[in-house]
């Protein structure tokens, strides 16, 4: 499975360099940056010693949404208190979740927020699943480079697995299901129920391939009967 690392508005060049070095160490190579030019500072390469190829191939996007244009499944890092109605997974819990997704999706992204404020609510809404590192200390904080290393270490086995032959045909099922569900909620005049919409959108990301296909069939039957 291809896994892209996305850094949203990183402020410090050293943090980008540390993230690139962590990626290189664990076999990751695709780094994207949103709304920042800090990687152009010399300090990025000083810290990213031996990881110049990752720095050279960084792709920059103005918004997180644009950076996810070719991604099938998005995981965003945040504190548990920000999760609201989202499913919240530890790094360990992400492994079986993404292993299942790799059988019918080819490209996932792991998103890290700003050093001082993390991701906005609008950015978190773009994620299929939220994740965070459980901390014991009273001041639960990892710097950006440390956080990237934790996740790259945990997920390294996934990028070593060959792509499934049937992934291309099914990888857009989840996005299509989201759009179909929202259309149905609009038809039922409940699309303005924020709690319901948030709950539904985040739980859809947990569905396995068979469940996704079955829900498509259910929505099809509901749509057909509504229009009678």
Swiss-Prot record:
Its EC number is 2.1.1.-. SUPFAM superfamilies: alpha/beta knot (SSF75217). It holds the Pfam family SpoU_methylase. GO terms for molecular function: protein homodimerization activity; RNA binding; RNA methyltransferase activity. Coiled coil: none annotated. S-adenosyl-L-methionine binds at residues 77-79, 113, 133, 140-142. InterPro entries: Alpha/beta_knot_MTases, RNA_MeTrfase_TrmJ/LasT, SpoU_MeTrfase, tRNA_m1G_MTases_N. Keywords: Methyltransferase, S-adenosyl-L-methionine, Transferase. GO terms for cellular component: cytosol. One of its GO terms (biological process) is tRNA nucleoside ribose methylation. Belongs to the class IV-like SAM-binding methyltransferase superfamily. RNA methyltransferase TrmH family. This is Uncharacterized tRNA/rRNA methyltransferase LasT. The lineage of its organism: Bacteria, Pseudomonadati, Pseudomonadota, Gammaproteobacteria, Enterobacterales. The gene is lasT.
């Amino acid at each position: 499975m291809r896994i892209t690392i996305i850094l949203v508005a990183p402020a410090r060049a050293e943090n980008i360099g540390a993230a690139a070095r962590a990626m290189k160490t664990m076999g990751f190579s695709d780094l994207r940056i949103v709304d920042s030019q800090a990687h152009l500072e010399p300090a990025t390469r000083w810290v990213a010693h031996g990881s110049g190829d990752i720095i050279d191939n960084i792709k920059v996007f103005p918004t997180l949404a644009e950076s996810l244009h070719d991604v099938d499944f998005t995981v965003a890092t945040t504190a548990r208190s920000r999760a609201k109605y989202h499913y919240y997974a530890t790094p360990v819990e992400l492994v079986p979740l993404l292993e299942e997704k790799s059988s019918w999706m080819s490209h996932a992204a792991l998103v890290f927020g700003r050093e001082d404020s993390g991701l906005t609510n609008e950015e978190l809404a773009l994620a299929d699943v939220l994740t965070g590192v459980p901390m014991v200390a009273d001041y639960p904080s990892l710097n950006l480079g440390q956080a990237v290393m934790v996740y790259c270490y945990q997920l390294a086995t996934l990028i070593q697995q060959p792509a499934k032959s049937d992934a291309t045909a099914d990888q857009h099922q989840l996005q299509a299901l989201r759009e179909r569900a929202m259309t149905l909620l609009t038809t039922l005049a409940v699309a303005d129920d924020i709690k319901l919409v948030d709950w539904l959108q985040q739980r859809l990301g947990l569905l396995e391939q068979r469940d996704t296909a079955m829900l498509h069939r259910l929505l099809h039957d509901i749509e057909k009967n509504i229009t009678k």
